[in-house]
């Protein structure tokens, strides 16, 4: 069984009789010598969907669960449900808007490549996205002539509604690459 410092986002833990999927991890390094590094983890309970927060020391042993990952394509929206199709056997996987509200900020209208669903014992757990996505800027203040790459940043609204900080020289209509986990601008899209 792994230690708490080996846990990554997207892993599933069996903790206190609950299946918890890791949504976010904050590492808190102590200032005193000899003190243990703390890992504050935010989870979603697989069965109830409730948000759970726990703290672990770096050397705490945790029980992880092995998941099945299947590549999917976004298919369609049916009311409050989002339907994804398995790329191999066309099995539909249905999520409610509440289950994937964080992920929806990164999924463009036509979907994106390399999306995966996580299942365990036939139970649908989560939707996992790739590390980056290319999105178009739909609204931002006009680009400033002569602005350099090291200039200040400004907020930009993307096609999915996500707002990120971008360099001043970018303008509406440009495609940019976003790091999904950190919700930050990485550069112009290819």
UniProtKB/Swiss-Prot annotation:
SUPFAM superfamilies: Nucleic acid-binding proteins, Translation proteins SH3-like domain. It comes from the Bacteria. PROSITE patterns: EFP. One of its GO terms (biological process) is peptide biosynthetic process. Pfam families: EFP, EFP_N, Elong-fact-P_C. SMART domains: EFP, Elong-fact-P_C. GO terms for molecular function: translation elongation factor activity. Signal peptide: none annotated. Transmembrane segments: none annotated. GO terms for cellular component: cytosol. InterPro entries: Elong-fact-P_C, NA-bd_OB-fold, Rib_uL2_dom2, Transl_elong_fac_P/YeiP, Transl_elong_KOW-like, Transl_elong_p-like_YeiP, Transl_elong_P/YeiP_cen, Transl_elong_P/YeiP_CS. Belongs to the elongation factor P family. This is Elongation factor P-like protein. It comes from Enterobacter sp. (strain 638).
């Amino acid at each position: 069984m792994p230690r708490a410092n080996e846990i990554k986002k997207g892993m599933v833990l069996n903790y206190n009789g609950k299946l918890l999927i890791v949504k976010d991890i904050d590492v808190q390094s102590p200032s005193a010598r000899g003190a243990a590094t703390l890992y504050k983890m935010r989870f979603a309970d697989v069965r109830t969907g409730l948000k759970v927060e726990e703290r672990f020391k770096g050397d705490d042993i945790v029980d992880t669960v092995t998941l099945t990952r299947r590549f999917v394509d976004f298919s369609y929206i049916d009311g409050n449900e989002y339907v994804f199709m398995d790329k191999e056997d066309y099995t539909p996987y249905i999520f409610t808007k509440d289950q994937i509200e964080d992920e929806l900020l990164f999924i463009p209208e036509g979907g994106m490549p390399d999306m995966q669903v996580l299942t365990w014992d036939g139970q649908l757990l989560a939707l996992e996205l790739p590390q980056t996505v290319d999105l178009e800027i739909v609204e931002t203040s006009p680009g400033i002539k002569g602005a350099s790459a090291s200039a200040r940043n400004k907020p930009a609204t993307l096609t999915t509604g996500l707002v990120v900080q971008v360099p001043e020289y970018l303008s509406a209509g440009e495609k940019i690459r976003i790091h999904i986990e950190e919700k930050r601008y990485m550069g112009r899209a290819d």
